[in-house]
Amino acid sequence: MSLRIDGKKISSDIKEELKEQVKLLKEEGISVCLTVIQVGSDPASSVYVNNKKKACAYIGIESQAYELPEETTQEELLSLISRLNKDDHVNGILVQLPVPAHMDEKEIIQAISPAKDVDGFHPQSVGALSTGEPGFVSCTPAGIIQLLKRSGISIDGKDCVVVGRSNIVGKPMSMLLLRENGTVTICHSHTKNLKEVCQRADILVAAIGKPKFFDDSYVKDGAVVIDVGIHRNEENKLCGDVDYDKVVDKVSAITPVPGGVGPMTIAMLMNNCVEAALRMNNR
């Protein structure tokens, strides 16, 4: 029987550890503060922002939220980011994506100080990851590493296949697996023999953005499957990139959707906020 990797439980454990750490920091006069900026009122973005606020409140991290109107200009947003960069009370700055179409997302990400880039999206953070320097790691890939480690799954020497090459998941995921001594293959829409490559994987990370794309023909017996996808099926139920019911009996471990990778993203964001406060206080 395969191990169902419980992201809810593991993320809860991490939040408890952070709660204790924040309490000890407060006793030393060190506070942790996350500022979230949302432009417009996209309902999904509002849910994500609310979840971040709740996690902050639980752990003891102060959260500030700027809810800016849709018509906010690029210059106005950059001016706010510049002000927050200079505010020593603020440890982490996060602009909820996507931003409205009239804005330049790349310029916005680059405007955030790398010292406060708790999303891990700044080019300096990405460069630090590839060279092994200290920096903030994108939250979803960092969460996946924690899922594997805390489930007793070794990455060292394993054949790891990442399907998807996005800047948020695929690319940083491949770098993190490499850092853990995995032998990494990254696949994408131009990969010719996708099924054959996936069948070789000891650890398969599915981040292709297509519901139930991966069935049992893509995985070998005893593989570990990490499902990053999140979709709604025709019955309006959540599902991932992996057809869970077809794959579960063939693999040694798998993340469900929901309750797998998703909860880890916010837990690792909170971890990055605490890390930012420690660095700002030379700890």
Task: State what each model feature region is.
Residues 101-102, 212-214, 233-234:
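Short glycine-rich, flexible loops that bind phosphorylated cofactors or substrates
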Residues 105-126, 226-280:
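Rossmann-fold NAD(P)-binding glycine/threonine-rich loop
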